[in-house]
UniProtKB/Swiss-Prot annotation:
InterPro entries with a match to the protein in the record: ATP_synth_OSCP/delta_N_sf, ATPase_OSCP/d_CS, ATPase_OSCP/dsu
Protein name per Swiss-Prot or TrEMBL: ATP synthase subunit delta
Role: F(1)F(0) ATP synthase produces ATP from ADP in the presence of a proton or sodium gradient. F-type ATPases consist of two structural domains, F(1) containing the extramembraneous catalytic core and F(0) containing the membrane proton channel, linked together by a central stalk and a peripheral stalk. During catalysis, ATP synthesis in the catalytic domain of F(1) is coupled via a rotary mechanism of the central stalk subunits to proton translocation.
Membrane-protein topology: Peripheral membrane protein
Subcellular location, record wording: Cell membrane
Keywords tagged on the record: ATP synthesis, Cell membrane, CF(1), Hydrogen ion transport, Ion transport, Membrane, Transport
Superkingdom field: Bacteria
Protein family (similarity comment): Belongs to the ATPase delta chain family.
Any single Gene Ontology cellular-component annotation: plasma membrane
Gene Ontology MF: a single term: proton-transporting ATP synthase activity, rotational mechanism
């Protein structure tokens, strides 16, 4: 029977989350996951090495050990060793992403994004987080901000399957459409 990498990653992530909760180190493991994503983003060759079947598992483990062992919690490092032993280092990025999703669900955290024509001040970030909380019940909101001059002003807030489009570009488009329909 074929099991996809996503299903396997989900099992590892779920086990990591449960073990971290049981050991009382969930926040440490969460920080480790964020650190791993940061390293992976700045060193894209790391992912290519992990996915490369030609590179020996011992070499992959040595690389992971040199980068992470002194910087992450022993539970997280144990996962890296386990994956190397089982020759599954290539799914580590998927495990990390899945772990973060499960962590956010466990903590009641929702991800939202806001698009404006400028960088947001701290006050505006708080405002948009509160606005997102009013749209979807949650304990906390992680807000990603995007700058896009094409919206011409206003904002577009997205959380889960909801979008609050209060951009000038959309309002102008609606007005244009309304006046093109209304013939004199």
């Amino acid at each position: 029977m074929y099991t996809s990498n996503i299903q396997v990653a989900s099992r590892y992530a779920k086990s990591l989350l449960k073990q971290a909760i049981d050991m009382g180190v969930l926040d440490h493991v969460y920080k480790d996951a964020l650190f791993f994503k940061k390293v992976g983003k700045s060193h894209k060759t790391l992912f290519r090495v992990l996915h490369n079947p030609i590179i020996k598992n011992e070499t992959k483990l040595a690389i992971l050990t040199s980068i992470f062992q002194s910087r992450i919690h022993p539970l997280t490092f144990h996962l890296l060793k386990l994956l190397s032993h089982r020759k599954r280092e290539g799914i580590l990025p998927t495990i990390i992403d899945t772990f973060l999703e499960q962590y956010y669900i466990y903590r009641g955290i929702k991800a939202a994004s806001v698009t404006t024509t400028f960088r947001l001040s701290d006050d505006l970030i708080r405002y948009f987080k509160n606005l997102a909380k009013s749209l979807v019940p949650c304990k906390e909101v992680i807000l990603k901000e995007y700058v896009n001059p094409s919206i011409q002003g206003g904002f577009v807030l997205r959380i889960e399957d909801q979008q609050l489009d209060n951009s000038l570009a959309t309002r102008l488009h609606k007005l244009k459409k309304q006046y093109s329909i209304a013939e004199y």
